[in-house]
Amino acid sequence: MRIDIITVLPEMIENTLNCSIIGRAQERGLLELKLHQLRDYSTDKWKRVDDYPFGGEPGMVMQIEPIDRIITELKTQREYDEVIFTSPDGERFDQPMANELSLLSNLIVLCGHYKGIDYRIREHLITREISIGDYVLTGGELAAAVMTDAIARLIPGVLNDAGSALSDTFQDNLLAPPVYTRPAEYKGWRVPDILLSGHEANIAKWRLEQAVERTKRLRPDLIKD
C-alpha cells in the first residue's frame, strides 16, 4: 500500500510514523509512505501557500494552485483510489472505515491548515473528507498520522499476530475485553481464574461477556437495538 501525504509540516508526521510498528512496515516494504512539502509547489517568492479570504473573513486560506500542482503531478505517476482531505467537517473516521481503506492500494491525504482550503479544492480535487473527531486542531498532520497508523496496522504482515487486529476494540462494534499477563497475582490483585483454566470455549465465552459488559458501561452508543 502507498500513502502520499501533502503537508506544510512533513517533519511532524515523519517523527510519528517512522518508528515502531509502522516504521518497520515501511522497512519491510509493506507500506510506502511519501511525505510531500506543499511549499515546494508554490511559485511565490516566499513559498507561501495561503492568502487572505475573499469577503473579509478573519484567518488565512490555503490556495488552490500549489495543491492542484502536487495532486496533478502525483496522478500522472499512478492511479489513486481516494484523495482525502483531513477536516473536522468530514465523515467520522472509525474502525470500519480503517478496515475499508486498508484494502485500497494508493491514497493521497491532504492536511488542512489555517482557516481552511479554497473551497474549489473540495469541489474538484478531493474525493473524500474525513474527520477524527468533533474538535479543531492547528493542522491536519495529527489526523493524517492517526488515520495512517490505524490503516497500516491492518495491512497483512504488519502485525506479527494478525489475530491481534481482529480482536481489537470496535472490530465487532464492541470494546475489547480485559487482558492480563504475568504475574498471575500482584499485591493480592488476581487475574480471573477463567483465564488460567486453559478451557478455550469458556475463555471465549468470558471474553465476549466482558466485551459486552464494558461496551454497555463505557460506550452504550455502540450497542445496537
UniProtKB/Swiss-Prot annotation:
Location of the protein in the cell: Cytoplasm
Q: What EC number(s) has UniProt assigned to this enzyme?
A: 2.1.1.228
Q: InterPro entries under this entry?
A: Alpha/beta_knot_MTases (IPR029028), tRNA_m1G_MeTrfase_C_sf (IPR023148), tRNA_m1G_MeTrfase_TrmD (IPR002649), tRNA_m1G_MTases_N (IPR029026), tRNA_MeTrfase_TRMD/TRM10 (IPR016009)
Does the entry feature the keyword Repressor, yes or no? no
Q: Which residues form the signal peptide?
A: none
Electron transport is among the record's keywords: no
* Protein keywords: Cytoplasm, Methyltransferase, S-adenosyl-L-methionine, Transferase, tRNA processing
The terms under GO molecular function for this entry are: tRNA (guanine(37)-N1)-methyltransferase activity
Task: Show the stretches that span the lipid bilayer.
Answer: none
The GO annotation for biological process reads: tRNA N1-guanine methylation
**Residues binding S-adenosyl-L-methionine:** 112, 132-137
GO CC terms on record? cytosol
Pfam families tied to this protein: tRNA_m1G_MT (PF01746)
Which reaction(s) does the protein catalyse, per the Swiss-Prot or TrEMBL entry? Answer: guanosine(37) in tRNA + S-adenosyl-L-methionine = N(1)-methylguanosine(37) in tRNA + S-adenosyl-L-homocysteine + H(+)
Q: What is the top EC class of this enzyme, as a single word?
A: transferase
The primary site where this protein sits is: cytoplasm
Q: PANTHER family in the record, alphabetically? A: TRNA (GUANINE-N(1)-)-METHYLTRANSFERASE (PTHR46417:SF1)
| Protein task | Specifically methylates guanosine-37 in various tRNAs.
Family designation: Belongs to the RNA methyltransferase TrmD family.
Q: Which HAMAP family match?
A: TrmD
* Subunit relationships: Homodimer.
Protein known as: tRNA (guanine-N(1)-)-methyltransferase
Record the organism. Porphyromonas gingivalis (strain ATCC BAA-308 / W83)
